[in-house]
Amino acid sequence: MKYIRDILELELKEEVNKLQRCSGGNINDVLECQTNNFHVALKINEAEKFPKMFDKEAEGLKLLSSTPFRIPKILKQGTFQKWSYLILEFINDKGSSYSDKKLGENLAKMHSITSNHFGLESDNYIGSIPQQNSLKKSWLSFYIEMRLQPLVKICFDQNRLNKGDIRLFEKLYLELDKIIPKEAPALLHGDLWQGNIISDEYSEPTLIDPAVYYGHREMDLSMLLLFGSISEQTIETYNDIFPLEKKWKERTDIHQLYPLLVHLTLFGESYLKPIQGIVGKYT
C-alpha cells in the first residue's frame, strides 16, 4: 500500500489519515482516502493493462457533467511508476434512496442532449473491454458495426459463439431496421445498471463509471431493465419530458444483446442462452 500513499501524498500534498478499500472495483482498485482537507476516491490500475482507461473515464465524466445528474468531480489524474490513477471527490453512497421521479427527469434531460452523429470522437471502454465509437450517420450502422460485430468476433475467437451463432447474427442484422425506430442520437451513460447510479448525501441520483457515446436512448433503459428494474414513476416522469416510442419495452431485448455479449466475453457461458434466445426470436 506504500505506493498508494505515495501517490496520494504527492498529489494532495497532505498526509493520509484514512485509507480503505471500497466495495466493487472488479477492474480497478478503488480506495477511500481522507486527509485533513480532502476526502477522495482513488481509482488505480496497471497502466499497461488498460491504456488510457482513466483518460477515457475522465472524458466521459466531463461530458456527463453537462447533464442534471451529479457527477464526481475530477481532482487529479496521472501515472506513478507502473500505475495509472484517477482521484475523484468522494461521494458517500446512500444506496438507492434517490427519488424515482428525479431519476426519470434527469434521464430524459440527459437523453435530450444530442449530436450530429452516433458514436463519439474517441474510443473508450465498457468495463475492461475497449469500446469502438467511430461516428456513423445511422443508429443501425453504428449498432451493428461498432457494438454487435466486434463483440460477436471476440466471443467467436474465445470459442463462446460458434459458426451457427454467427450465421444467425448475420440474419438478425437484416431484420433490425424493421424493429428499431429511428431516433436522433442521444447522450448515453453507456453502462447504466443500478450499481452505476448511486445516491449522494442529498438523495440526488449520481452517475459513476461511464462508457459514454451518442446512441439510441433505448440502450440505457434496456440495460437498466436487464440488470434490475425501472419504476413506473421513473418511466412516467421520463415520458412527460421526452416521450418514448410505442412498444419500447417489447424490443428492449434487442438492445440488451450488447451488454449480454460484453458479459459473455468477460464472464463466460452463463450468458450464452439469453443471447441465443434473443437472436432466435427475431430470425
Model-derived segments and their meaning:
Residues 263-283:
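ATP/Mg2+ or Mg2+-diphosphate-binding catalytic cores
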Residues 12-20:
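Conserved N-terminal boundary motif of the eukaryotic protein kinase catalytic domain
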Residues 1-10, 115-187:
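An alpha-helical support segment within catalytic cores of ATP-dependent transferases
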Residues 68, 111-118, 155, 180, ...:
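A general structural signal marking secondary-structure boundaries and capping sites
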Residues 20-137, 141:
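ATP-binding pocket architecture of kinase catalytic cores
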Residues 254-262:
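Short helix/strand-capping connector loops at secondary-structure junctions
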Residues 132-133, 139-144, 153, 184-187, ...:
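Active-site Asp-x-Gly
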Residues 15, 36-40, 204:
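Short acidic/polar mixed-charge low-complexity motifs
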